[in-house]
From Swiss-Prot:
InterPro entries: APCDD1, APCDD1_dom. It comes from the Eukaryota. GO terms for cellular component: plasma membrane. This is Protein APCDD1-like. Its main location: membrane. Residues 1-24 form the signal peptide. Glycans are attached at residue 150. The chain crosses the membrane at residues 481-501.
Length: 501
């Protein structure tokens, strides 16, 4: 979102602001505004990565997923000790996954290789597809897929494997790939299974009211490129929304049982979520350490002031997948327009955001050194940068070394929902995979990032000058400035992406 001004080479993680003791103040009587949802992520959402990842067993979506396009789907994957896998992908006509269109059955073999040198905490894998079949749940879906295939020469060969619309049979399985059916019809449909080439498994404990915490296992697979034309060649460096173990998933989860019991002939029909009208206001935070393509680890905090249509955000970048090693923090602010219903993504609202102010706080030695080596006129003006000290970069029109450019306009997509626990969720448009910015209406997102959670209904006032805002000079997870060993190579690789901004 408005953070697009930040390079996709950097990682922002919102750790939560708190008020530090004033200079000369005695003792520990510091004023804090830090509710539970704004406590440091490692403290409030502890998780453990399983290395090497153990894939065996069934994994399911926990709700309706939105991929760029948009495509609405749910997934149910099963991995076997023999390295074989069976994947069901259920596609829908609607954004609530209540009107099945067609289902894919994908069978193949996957082999874990080595720890990823690009995405920390992930494992690279190879896969081979043995069979791909498709079942159409309506005549309309058959006509739609056939029309897509007929747009290319290779697709027309694949379209011949499908029946004419008048001969549609409910439940019939048509092979798109097998030992008998040669050729890659997945490519003609714009589909790949490259998500299997990047894997991460982690465990966490979900607190339960009046009961022991519940074990939750999550499977993160590689992200899907936001440009369909690039998906065939793209190798993931980020993740999709995670699947969860069918045996160890969050509770309550109305969709989980439906998806776990489904098959290619009986797709799950999900109950619609409680959609909320988009009334921006309050204080929204990341629910976990987020991962973006090009090795970004971050959390976000946004406040929206509905009466003035202004917004503010803190982005904390980290160098590790647990969001414990901070690299730098960005404060950004601006205004947004009144939203209008999206005609392209049902259930979404289109807005335009303007970024007019930004402040930067280097949080490790490498970032501090990089900023001190940059031209003063390109980031913050004259004066040396020091670790943990915030500086205003508005007067220099941003901070070129970090890819921040001001003023900046973005065309956004928002939606709000309520989860089964009654929490309000805010979905913001997915960032372009190539690191560019949605700075034209044509580049407006058609899918969403991980949701933010409503932390407080009234937005705290971040608009006053930095010296009067809650101090970010101490890392909340340690009580003092955390100096993370952040290697120079990832930073250099990251800065290579800046030519896209």
């Amino acid at each position: 979102m408005p953070a697009a001004m930040l390079p996709y080479a950097c990682v922002l993680v919102l750790l939560g602001a708190h008020t530090a003791p004033a200079a000369g103040e005695a003792g520990g009587s510091c004023l804090r505004w830090e509710p539970h949802c704004q406590q440091p992520l490692p403290d409030r959402v502890p998780s453990t990565a399983i290395l090497p990842p153990r894939l065996n067993g069934p994994w399911i979506s926990t709700g309706c997923e939105v991929r760029p396009g948009p495509e609405f789907l749910t997934r149910a994957y099963t991995f076997y000790p023999s390295r074989l896998f069976r994947a069901h992908q259920f596609y829908y006509e609607d954004p609530f996954c209540g009107e099945p269109a067609h289902s894919l059955l994908v069978k193949g073999k996957v082999r874990l290789r080595r720890a990823s040198w690009v995405t920390r905490g992930a494992t690279e894998a190879d896969y081979h597809l043995h069979k791909v079949g498709i079942v159409f749940h309506s005549r309309r879906a058959l006509v739609d897929v056939t029309g897509r295939l007929n747009q290319t020469r290779a697709g027309r060969d694949c379209a011949r494997r499908l029946p004419p619309a008048r001969a549609w049979l409910p439940g019939a399985l048509y092979e798109l790939r097998s030992a008998r059916a040669q050729g890659d019809c997945l490519e003609a449909l714009g589909l790949t299974m490259h998500e299997l080439s990047l894997v991460r498994v982690q465990r966490r404990l979900q607190p339960q009211p009046r009961a022991s915490p519940r074990l939750v296992e999550e499977l993160y697979l590689g992200d899907i490129h936001t440009d369909p034309a690039e998906r065939r060649h793209y190798r993931p460096t980020g993740y999709q929304r995670p699947l969860q173990s069918a045996l160890h998933h969050v509770q309550p989860c109305p969709a989980c049982g439906l998806i776990a019991r489904s098959d290619v002939h009986h797709p799950p029909v999900l109950p619609p979520p409680l959609a909320l009208p988009l009334h921006l206001g309050g204080w929204w935070v990341s629910s976990g350490c987020e991962v973006r393509p090009a090795v970004l680890f971050l959390t976000r905090l946004f406040t929206f002031h509905g009466h003035s249509r202004s917004w503010e955000g803190y982005y904390h970048h980290f160098s590790d997948p647990a969001c414990r090693q901070p690299t730098f923090t960005v404060y950004a602010a601006g205004r947004y327009t009144r939203g209008t219903p999206s005609t392209r993504v049902r259930g979404g609202t289109e807005l335009v955001f303007e970024v007019t102010r930004a402040h930067v706080t280097p949080m490790d030695q490498v970032t501090t050194a990089m900023l001190n080596f940059s031209e003063p006129s390109s980031c913050g003006g004259a004066g040396a940068w020091s670790m943990g000290t915030e500086r205003d970069v508005t007067a220099t029109n941003g901070c070129l070394p970090l890819g921040i450019r001001l003023p900046h306009v973005e065309y956004e997509l928002f939606k709000m929902e309520q989860d089964p626990l009654g929490q309000s969720l805010l979905f913001i448009g997915q960032r372009p995979t190539d690191g560019s910015s949605p700075d034209t209406p044509e580049k407006r997102p058609t899918s969403y990032q991980a949701p933010l959670v409503l932390c407080h209904g009234e937005a705290p006032d971040f608009s006053r000058p930095p010296q009067h805002r809650p101090s970010l000079q101490k890392h909340p997870s340690t009580g003092g400035l955390h100096i993370a060993p952040f290697p120079l190579l990832p930073l250099v690789l990251g800065l290579a992406f800046l030519h896209w901004l």
